[in-house]
């Protein structure tokens, strides 16, 4: 087992799990371990994480700022598609995995490694996402998933291994209440009291957004400018994709926007309960959707909308690097060519309320839509339209 693998590239956070994994792989496979720590805007202090990896046994430690790449090449394409899983989840965890895996594979090539490794458990979706992405990018690389191989079954087992191997960890008394995953788009919470779907999430699950009870009593109005479906400015100030997300996180989070508590269907077959905070993404999704209302032709909009579940499932299930997702993206991006304009949004007590929109490509005609007297639309013409559309269903209601 260990002879064929001489070097492994590990997705490394610096926490207990991946620190134990680093040492376990080095010992079990008798190989070199190179680590990758990706800054995806998770708001964690990554200073010293490379030194910790090296002290734990890594031969080289990469710490990379991938925030702009993450926002530009992964979040924004998904937002253009209005992707939302099971009608509710904005895919904050799912969309991060393809980028991390791509860098793992690229580093593996640069380092001459034979395998990549991750710390996802054998019960969740992330193992699938990492490994499908790796297979798509380089099927010759082996993927090591320690949670499916080793005998450890609890946090205590990991702590004991860490103590035996001089791996520095935080004390057990400081452990988090939940299993958490955070990046610039969202923060997710699972486990603990959340495993009972009847329990209300506790105060420890509020990191990016305040409880609505604590949100300001006055609404806040903002404007978001879009070009070809991508947000480019907030309140008239041009910003990079990552800065757009970060700014909207601050604005939305202050007003309690973007909280979601749901039971979802995992790709691996079980249901799981998760609590998600996606303040900036929720604001962006609502504003973009609203602008499409005046910019997109009806049939193009309806066609794209019919494909939202397919696109969202591709992201959720780990098929970012797939012919179907790329084909869907091509259709989506065609629809976005004229989604350019400005949306005015009101933020208040957990709500995102679009209250105004304008676009140089607007298909909305006030002279046609008016309820006042007009000289453009002959209302009598509607009679023939209705008559022709009734032919197919005439008498249908009498069949039963």
Swiss-Prot record:
ATP binds at residues 11-19, 38, 119. One of its GO terms (cellular component) is cytoplasm. GO terms for biological process: argininosuccinate metabolic process; L-arginine biosynthetic process; urea cycle. Pathway: Amino-acid biosynthesis; L-arginine biosynthesis; L-arginine from L-ornithine and carbamoyl phosphate: step 2/3. Gene3D superfamilies: Argininosuccinate synthetase, chain A, domain 2, HUPs. The keyword Transcription regulation does not apply. It catalyses: L-citrulline + L-aspartate + ATP = 2-(N(omega)-L-arginino)succinate + AMP + diphosphate + H(+). L-citrulline binds at residues 89, 94, 125, 129, 179, 188, 264, 276. The keyword Transport does not apply. Its main location: cytoplasm. Pfam families: Arginosuc_syn_C, Arginosuc_synth. It is found in: Cytoplasm. One of its GO terms (molecular function) is ATP binding. SUPFAM superfamilies: Adenine nucleotide alpha hydrolases-like, Argininosuccinate synthetase, C-terminal domain. L-aspartate binds at residues 121, 125-126. Homotetramer. PANTHER family: ARGININOSUCCINATE SYNTHASE. Belongs to the argininosuccinate synthase family. Type 1 subfamily. NCBIfam families: argG, PRK00509.1. This is Argininosuccinate synthase. It comes from Oleidesulfovibrio alaskensis (strain ATCC BAA-1058 / DSM 17464 / G20).
């Amino acid at each position: 087992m260990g002879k064929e693998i001489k070097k492994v590239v590990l997705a490394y956070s610096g926490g207990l799990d991946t620190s134990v994994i680093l040492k376990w792989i080095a010992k079990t496979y008798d190989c070199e371990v190179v680590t990758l720590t990706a800054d995806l805007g998770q708001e964690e202090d990554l200073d010293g994480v490379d030194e910790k990896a090296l002290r734990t046994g890594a031969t080289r430690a990469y710490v990379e700022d991938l925030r702009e790449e993450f926002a530009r090449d992964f979040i924004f394409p998904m937002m253009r598609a209005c992707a939302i899983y099971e009608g509710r989840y904005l895919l904050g965890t799912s969309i991060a995995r393809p980028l991390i895996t791509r860098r793992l594979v690229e580093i593996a090539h640069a380092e001459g490694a034979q395998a990549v490794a991750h710390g996802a458990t054998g019960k969740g979706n992330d193992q699938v996402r990492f490994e499908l992405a790796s297979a798509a990018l380089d099927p010759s690389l082996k993927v090591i998933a320690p949670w499916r191989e080793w005998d450890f079954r609890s946090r205590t087992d990991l702590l004991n291994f860490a103590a035996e191997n001089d791996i520095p960890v935080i004390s057990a008394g400081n452990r988090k209440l939940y299993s958490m995953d955070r990046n610039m788009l969202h923060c997710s919470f699972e486990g603990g009291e959340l495993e009972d779907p009847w329990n209300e999430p506790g105060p420890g699950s509020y990191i990016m957004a305040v409880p609505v009870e604590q949100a300001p009593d006055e609404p806040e109005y903002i404007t978001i400018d879009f070009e070809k479906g991508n947000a480019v400015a907030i309140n008239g100030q041009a910003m990079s994709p990552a800065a757009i997300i970060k700014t909207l996180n601050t604005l939305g989070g202050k007003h309690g926007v973007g909280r979601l508590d749901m039971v979802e269907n995992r790709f691996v077959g079980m249901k799981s309960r998760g609590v998600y905070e996606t303040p900036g993404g929720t604001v962006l999704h609502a504003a973009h959707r609203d602008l499409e209302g005046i910019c997109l032709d009806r049939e193009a909009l309806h066609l794209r909308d019919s494909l939202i579940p397919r696109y969202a499932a591709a992201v959720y299930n780990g098929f970012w690097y797939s012919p179907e997702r790329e084909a869907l993206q091509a259709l989506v991006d065609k629809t976005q060519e004229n989604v350019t304009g400005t949306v005015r949004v009101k933020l208040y007590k957990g709500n995102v309320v679009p209250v105004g929109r304008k676009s140089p490509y607007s298909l909305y005609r006030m002279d046609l839509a008016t309820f006042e007297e007009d000289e453009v639309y002959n209302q009598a013409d509607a009679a023939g339209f209705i008559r022709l559309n009734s032919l197919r269903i005439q008498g249908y209601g009498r069949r039963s």
